[in-house]
Amino acid sequence: MKKFLFFSMMVCLLAFVSFGCKPDNAATNAGNKPAQTTAASFAEITDSEKRKVVLAKKPERVVVMVPSILNYVDAVGGTIIGRPSSSKASVIPPSMEKAEDIGHVFNINMEKVVGLKPDLVFINAAQHQKFIKMLETNNINAITLQPKTYEETKEALVITGKVYGKAAEAEKLNKAMDDKIAATVAKMPKEHKKRIVILHATPSTVTVELDNSIAGNAAKMLGFVNIAQGTTAIQGKPEKAPYSIEVLVEKDPEIIFITSMGAQDKIEKRLKADVQGNPAYSALTAVKNNKVYILPEDLFLTPPGLRYPDAVELMAKDVFPENFK
């Protein structure tokens, strides 16, 4: 019995010395904090394509391929080393004008991007998905963002805030947008349920926009009823559906919104050929009541970002100007 007791005590003593701590406190260190076997990551992010991106440390060399995301970065006080060229529909924030120009959003110079040695690149899922493998091969993190709806816009801002360690600032900005949109919605006639259609014109075609487009989402928040909702979307363009004058006549929208992309003279020619030149168009309620509105590209073609409340308010003012005096 004594030998057994002595043996047991020796085992406990050896175990205590080996681990350097009490058996019931094996996960604490000298500072009385849990011991960490691996370094904690700076941030774990799930992007718009549901890809999980782990950032080991705060990014210091960020390249942005998406013009609209520049405003998100600027809003949270972030910095960049590379950005796309400016265009009529996308203005570069003053604080980012000196960043390296990596080419147009549809024609990114990937050699220049890799040469900048970034530790993170923001990309657009639609245009830049093909670059992910190249970036990862060069040990460059890629985060895809493609915000069109308001909820996607807020989520993109949250992600941008996490990247720059400014999560609280991002939440404040989202709250401010929520408040502005709520104020606009409060001025709308109660349960008006006006029927609308959103035509999207380019020099080559006319389509209609669904609720998951920028204009469609803004219209939905304002209580408009999109006559195209429920229509099968065009393959590869989930926010658009085919245009049909027959459906337009059948549904007879009370309001017509028009978004466009391209040279104005060519767009007007296309609208006249496909829409306005048809005698049935003149008989539509929206046309007879002069309720046809052209929506600006800077708010409804490229994602408006933090200007989403402006897009919603503009649409509301177009239709109900008397409510915003």
What are these regions (language model features)?
Residues 3-6, 10, 19-68, 168-199, ...:
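Bacterial Sec-exported substrate-binding components of ABC uptake systems
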Residues 48-50, 100-111, 233-245:
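Short helix-initiation/N-cap motifs at beta->coil->alpha
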Residues 92-95, 127-163, 293:
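Flexible loop/hinge segments that line or gate small-molecule binding clefts
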Residues 154-155, 162, 171, 182-185, ...:
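Structured C-terminal subdomain patch of bacterial secreted/periplasmic proteins
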Residues 66-116, 120-125, 227:
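A short, structured surface patch at a secondary-structure boundary
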Residues 61-65, 81-84, 120-124, 142-145, ...:
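Structural recognition of the beta-strand scaffold that forms the well-ordered cores
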Residues 87-90, 208-239:
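Alpha-helical, coiled-coil/dimerization segments enriched in small aliphatic residues
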